[in-house]
Amino acid sequence: MSALLNITEPNNNTNSNDNDFLASLTTDAPQAIASKYSREQIAQLFDLPLMDLLLQAQTIHRQNFNANEVQISTLLSIKTGNCPEDCGYCSQSGHHRDKTKLVAEKRIEVDKVIAAAKRAKATGSSRFCMGAAWKHPSAKDMPYVVELVKEVKALGLETCMTLGMLDTDQAAQLADAGLDYYNHNLDTSRSYYEQVVSTRSYDERLDTITNVRNSGINVCSGNIVGMGESRDDRIDWVHELLKMPKAPESIPVNLLVPIQGTPIGDKVLAEGQLSVLEWIRTIAVTRICCPSSYVRLSAGRESLSDAEQALAFMAGANSFFYGDKLLTTGNASQSGDDRLMRELGLTKQFAAPRAPKQVPVIDAMSGHQSQVVLAS
């Protein structure tokens, strides 16, 4: 594993322990140091000058992935609205339906889901994600979702589901069906969580993630940036990922889409939205701390410029949702995504990622030889 570029400079306001940590980014293999990150060290990463942070994140990204290849997923709502949870950002909550005016829909028939999966595969998605607005799937729902997993996998697609909380038996059923990923976001820090949701505890979210992990299904778990939380909350969220026995294989970093009629959406619309650059910082720190995870651009891309999305990829994102809709919110258009990928020189990942190619590079200033990873 290669060493990172040494970008630290003497700073009279930084103590020696801080300098030692930042210097370690230039000498330690990312996988070796990730589990050592303390909360204070994660905070130091957030505080780096943005260009330095992006350089570190992109270098680590290239050590673990093909830098110019992205994984494409498509997301379909298989049961929409009237959710019993009170998530303050979500239009699907039954608690907000009088204000959001979202029309609830029953479960989609299996054949219609399969038709959507076929369309997703034809346009280049390698993973098909299915979401249902439930607190948890009921016993009568399990045969339905198990059938969906089997039918979608038969098309040659990876499968992902987000259905709310799972107990150990439900996780085992989905694992037996062949489910590849299960999404259950932490959303934010433990301390800010009570400002977001009251009908499901933070520990219940962690319990579901544990049940998924123990079943052998890959974990997908991320956050929503821009709900009124502080940077400290974003630091705590990253630290929470590192407390897990293993970091999630897939980490969606959502940028809040404020929906009128939801408590958090109304608050953000009134007070102003978070800087996109802070979202990009969060992506970069996530990439550094979770070097082998896929970091996905999820909600919020529709409002971003090409340059902002390019910075997100520079920060280490290597996956995004493809399609004009994410559950009930808009998404960047497929034609726009195709054009952006062409302009950035990005290609779609259709199979298992190839091993990165390393080449020796001599630092002109020090004469030190290191390895730089090129796209294969």
Swiss-Prot record:
Gene3D superfamilies, per the entry: Aldolase class I
Lineage, uppermost ranks: Bacteria, Pseudomonadati, Pseudomonadota, Gammaproteobacteria, Moraxellales
Name this protein carries in UniProt: Biotin synthase
Function summary: Catalyzes the conversion of dethiobiotin (DTB) to biotin by the insertion of a sulfur atom into dethiobiotin via a radical-based mechanism.
Swiss-Prot/TrEMBL catalytic activity: (4R,5S)-dethiobiotin + (sulfur carrier)-SH + 2 reduced [2Fe-2S]-[ferredoxin] + 2 S-adenosyl-L-methionine = (sulfur carrier)-H + biotin + 2 5'-deoxyadenosine + 2 L-methionine + 2 oxidized [2Fe-2S]-[ferredoxin]
Keywords of this entry: 2Fe-2S, 4Fe-4S, Biotin biosynthesis, Iron, Iron-sulfur, Metal-binding, S-adenosyl-L-methionine, Transferase
PANTHER family, sorted: BIOTIN SYNTHASE, BIOTIN SYNTHASE, MITOCHONDRIAL
EC number of this enzyme: 2.8.1.6
InterPro entries xref list: Aldolase_TIM, BATS_dom, Biotin_synth/BioAB, Biotin_synthase, Elp3/MiaA/NifB-like_rSAM, rSAM
Organism (species): Psychrobacter cryohalolentis (strain ATCC BAA-1226 / DSM 17306 / VKM B-2378 / K5)
Positions with a binding annotation for [4Fe-4S] cluster: 83, 87, 90
